[in-house]
């Protein structure tokens, strides 16, 4: 496997993973013993940057210095503060992507520069472009953005000879998608998608944490809502209970010294049974049933057309999810590909296809949203504005190009303001505004007539929109990427973000053996009569370990840990 390798990345809300294809099969590249990595970034009290498990471990203790679930803010103008630093969602995602890049490079033994990254099928155009920007900040050329349920179907369908229609139900930590996919002779064709980019395990945790908070207040008379650290610990307890309830009928939520009253410590100890939990999340789960039906309707299918139902995402371990999907489809769900790894594995397959590896699969995807512009329509009452004219309808196969001709409202009009929207509402302003720009200097084809403009939408394989306009009178054209008009980072901003990321190197965590080794060395330095040269060797080894950790250089860190072990063996013998 050469430096031309393209890696596949599942950039998840709560967990992320990286994969490649080896021997015609996709494999997860683990980070030490972890096959999936928490999508968490933090700044330690010592000013060290933490990514993954080390950041997650500090979250309950220092929520103000830790960022989780940043994926939900991709494509927005929200910023987050860590210490003295202010970051965009793209910046935080770049921390995670850089760590996954490092994991891949450690396994492959060479630099990695290209990637395929997955996103929810229902991600907006702006969120998709933000994901590409995050990859660029992390030093990755993003070769393709593909939808998560599509990636899972690609992993599932690899080398399967039988033709089948598969419903992919993808419920992760922060987003939900359902897709209808046809697998025919190595072609993976998406027929329809539907979903919700703000529905997942995080929401279940929040509901259960609120249930625990109310139980704690009822028992102790203390309201924890304004105690950020206590609420983070409640959320952590809720997540543990949720996971345990997937395999047990009841579970205990326990957190010692959660608060104090009158100088006395107060502990959380609440039992939750599975029926209670299912009651809390019932309405959210029911909303996914609507998405299943909508996807079937859009694909012009019924449940009788389905051959398989594939469950993807960590939240599909919840028994109530299985029951709902079985009831909604009439089929027993399958988990033939690991639910938490399926998306990353599919990304690895798509990456291998782009890299030219001999993979017998072709991916055909769709756009989940309609795309159009605001227009005015003539009615019996006169002109009515804020109407929505759709150029590309939802569930159109991508890539796709569509165009339409629009006229000005009156002969002398030489300027139009083009507002580009994404959504399904007939009132334009009720949809998501992707951007707007002015087109001036319009000329009619013949004097006294209305000027006419051809508007062309081109949606590429990444689901990113290009808009072109053509003045039929003057022949002048203009073109722009829709997201360049709204929330997209400029090239200068990306360069600045790359510089910030380079300066904010994550500190590698030591495992238990490494911590013990460093601790032994420090005790030897403090308590033993050492020759100056021996003490100097120990000090140098500790300094080099610390430097490698700060630089995120794991091979160098391991080399110096081995050197330290040899030194201690000689000194302690």
List each language-model region with its residue ranges.
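Oxyanion-binding/catalytic loops of NTP- or PPi-dependent enzymes
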Residues: 1-76, 80-86, 95, 104-573
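Conserved cytochrome P450 K-helix/beta-meander segment immediately N-terminal to the heme-binding cysteine loop
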Residues: 98
């Amino acid at each position: 496997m050469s430096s031309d390798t393209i890696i596949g990345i599942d950039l998840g809300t709560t967990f992320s993973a990286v994969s490649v294809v080896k021997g015609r099969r996709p494999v997860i590249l683990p980070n030490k013993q972890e096959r999936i990595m928490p999508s968490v970034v933090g700044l330690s009290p010592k000013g060290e940057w933490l990514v993954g498990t080390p950041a997650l471990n500090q979250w309950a203790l220092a929520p103000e210095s830790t960022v989780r679930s940043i994926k939900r803010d991709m494509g927005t103008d929200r910023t987050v503060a860590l210490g003295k630093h202010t970051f965009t969602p793209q910046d935080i995602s770049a921390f995670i992507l850089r760590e996954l890049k490092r994991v891949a490079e450690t396994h492959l033994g060479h630099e990695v520069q290209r990637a395929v990254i997955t996103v929810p099928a229902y991600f907006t155009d702006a969120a998709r472009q933000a994901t590409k920007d995050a990859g660029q900040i992390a030093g990755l050329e993003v070769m393709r953005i593909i939808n998560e349920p599509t990636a899972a179907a690609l992993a599932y369908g690899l080398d399967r000879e039988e033709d089948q229609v598969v419903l992919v139900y993808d419920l992760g930590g922060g987003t939900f998608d359902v897709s209808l996919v046809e697998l025919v002779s190595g072609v993976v064709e998406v027929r329809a998608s539907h979903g919700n980019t703000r529905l997942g395990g995080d929401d279940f945790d929040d509901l259960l944490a609120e249930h625990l908070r109310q139980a704690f207040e009822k028992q102790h008379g203390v309201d924890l809502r304004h105690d950020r650290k206590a609420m983070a610990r409640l959320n952590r307890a809720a997540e543990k209970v949720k996971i345990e309830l997937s395999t047990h009928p009841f579970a205990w939520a326990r957190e010692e010294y959660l608060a104090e009253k009158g100088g006395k410590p107060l502990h959380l100890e609440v039992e939750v049974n599975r029926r209670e939990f299912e009651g809390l999340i019932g309405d959210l789960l029911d909303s996914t049933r609507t998405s299943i039906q909508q996807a079937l309707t859009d694909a012009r299918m019924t449940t009788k057309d389905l051959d398989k139902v594939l469950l993807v995402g960590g939240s599909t371990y919840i028994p109530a999810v299985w029951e709902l999907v079985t009831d909604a489809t009439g089929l027993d769900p399958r988990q033939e590909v690991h639910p938490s790894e399926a998306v990353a594995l599919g990304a690895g397959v798509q990456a291998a296809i782009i890299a030219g590896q001999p993979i017998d699969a072709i991916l055909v995807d769709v756009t989940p949203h309609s795309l159009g512009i605001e227009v005015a329509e003539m009615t019996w009452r006169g002109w009515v504005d804020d109407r929505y004219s759709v150029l590309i309808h939802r569930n159109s196969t991508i890539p796709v190009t569509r165009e339409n001709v629009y006229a000005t409202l009156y002969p002398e009009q030489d300027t139009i303001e083009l507002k580009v929207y994404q959504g399904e509402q007939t009132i334009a302003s009720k949809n998501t505004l992707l951007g707007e720009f002015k087109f001036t200097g319009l000329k009619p084809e013949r004097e006294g007539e209305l000027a006419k403009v051809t508007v062309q939408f081109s949606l590429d394989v990444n689901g990113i929109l290009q808009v072109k306009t053509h003045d039929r009178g003057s022949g002048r054209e203009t073109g722009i990427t829709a997201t360049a008009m709204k929330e997209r980072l400029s090239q200068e901003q990306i360069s600045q973000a790359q510089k910030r990321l380079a300066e904010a190197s994550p500190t590698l965590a030591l495992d238990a053996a490494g911590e013990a080794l460093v601790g032994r060395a420090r005790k030897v330095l403090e308590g033993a009569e050492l020759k100056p040269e021996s003490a100097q060797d120990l000090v140098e080894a500790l300094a080099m370990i610390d430097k490698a950790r700060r630089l995120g250089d794991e091979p160098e860190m391991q080399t110096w840990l081995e050197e330290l072990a040899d030194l201690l063996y000689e000194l302690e013998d």
